[in-house]
Amino acid sequence: MIKTCIIGASGYTGAELAALVHRHEQFELATLYVSTNSADAGKSLGDIHPQFFNVIDLPLQPIDEDNLSALSDRFDLIFLATPHEASHKWMNELCAEKNGQKAVIMDLSGAFRIKDKNKFAEYYGFEHHADKLLEQAVYGLADWHQEQISSANLVAVPGCYPTASLTALKPLQQNALIDSTHFPIINAVSGVSGAGRKAALNNNFTEVSLQAYGVLGHRHQPEIADYLGTDVIFTPHLGNFKRGILATITIKTAANVTNQQITEAYQQAYQGNPIVRLRNNWPKIDDVVGTPYCDLFWKFDPKTGYLIVTSAIDNLLKGAASQAMQCANLRFGFESHRGLVN
């Protein structure tokens, strides 16, 4: 059994991770950690998230920040569902080898996703100082970076919007079907759970009305652009529903592209992949909530050369926890969908 802990287990993503690890026959959910100042310290996961009552009743233990390196001795796999700054602050200690052993780290924060450390001050609000780890971190886009993930000791699990967007766009980019003089335009709507569990007026369900935010400055824009290989125009929106993301993407295709080429690009990319579902109609958020799937559908206008693609995911699962589990599966030699789909 692969002995596993989760740091930041009280949040929405941490709880989803706990459920996935608990159900996986090859992983042992050994310990759940929260920060030392967390109001949830000492409680059980089932007390905070009642769906896990009498299912996962492990206590939420306050993490000892002065002895982080010892976790590499205790665990084979560490998930971090922590704020970006916490992952950045703790990572050197967590990755330190002790007694010749080093745990595999799956970081669900944004602290190691983008490679240009100078962008962190602009997009994340802190100066990045872990140059070596930033260079070593593998971007965990699980349906595209399988080989790199399989040997990585630090995986930066992608953000929710980048997951939805890159899954839709990479087959086109890989086959040179995008007009390089026109940036893809991504309009995406997320449920309020994407803002986290901490109470705030701007994500209070009764206060939320469909609204754009982070316009021309959201931290996921450089992440999408870096791993697509071209700039994009990305506009996120907050919707008044709990969970899920629907991204609608407008692409100007390269000259003389045909609908058959587009279809073949998607089929070649995702044939035999049970996680990415190529639909025969426009997906709804309800189709993917509570699942690890990414649902795609598209329509091409050959007269204008414009292509519209929709991508639907659960932001807490495919956009976070289940993709982290895909990465863990790959790293430990299992099929990426093991424990996620039948």
Place the predicted regions along the sequence by residue.
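C-terminal active-site/capping subdomain that shapes the small-molecule cofactor and substrate pocket
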Residues: T250-N342
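Contiguous C-terminal substrate-recognition/catalytic subdomains in enzyme active sites
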Residues: L68, N202-V289
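Alpha-helical scaffold segments in soluble metabolic enzymes
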Residues: E16, T167, P171, E223-Y227, ...
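A short coil-to-beta-strand element that immediately follows conserved catalytic motifs
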Residues: L29, T181-I186, I233, I275-R279, ...
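Short, solvent-exposed beta-strand edge segments and adjacent coil->beta transition regions
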Residues: A152, G244-T248, I308
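Conserved active-site and cofactor/substrate-binding residues in soluble primary-metabolism enzymes
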Residues: Y12, Q136, T163-T167, V215-P222, ...
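Conserved short hydrophobic interaction patches
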Residues: L20, H24, E97, Y227, ...
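N-terminal Rossmann-like NAD(P) cofactor-binding subdomain of oxidoreductases
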Residues: I2-T206, Q211-Y213, F300-P302
